[in-house]
């Protein structure tokens, strides 16, 4: 079954955050999909960590190597539909891409972002619960 995954989940797994094992277990049998924009979100997250001196460039490269090992299929989402969703829900485009992806592929969403979870549920998207 396809499952839409967001950057918060990917970062939690590759950064060995406390939810890592649970996230892996919850997605073990899923085919992970994400809009292509997630690639740039991951890069942005690591550049922010570098800027804040939370990680070194070496650690960022190791994390990117771990990221490349995650079986993730990048999918296209309709830009116009995503912008419509962003406008209607008053959300950022990156979140709208995820909502659009889940709707377009009729797939559940897994995220650690509580606001995104609420928005998805309001759109009748199944949200995979993560205990944080």
Give the residues covered by each predicted segment.
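Acidic, PIN/NYN-like endoribonuclease modules and their adjacent C-terminal/linker elements
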Residues: 2, 35, 99-132
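Active-site-proximal, substrate-binding regions of enzyme catalytic domains
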Residues: 43-73, 77-79
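Active-site neighborhoods of divalent-metal-dependent phosphate/nucleic-acid chemistry enzymes
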Residues: 70-108, 112-115
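A cross-family signal for key residues in well-ordered alpha-helices
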Residues: 11-12, 24, 44, 83, ...
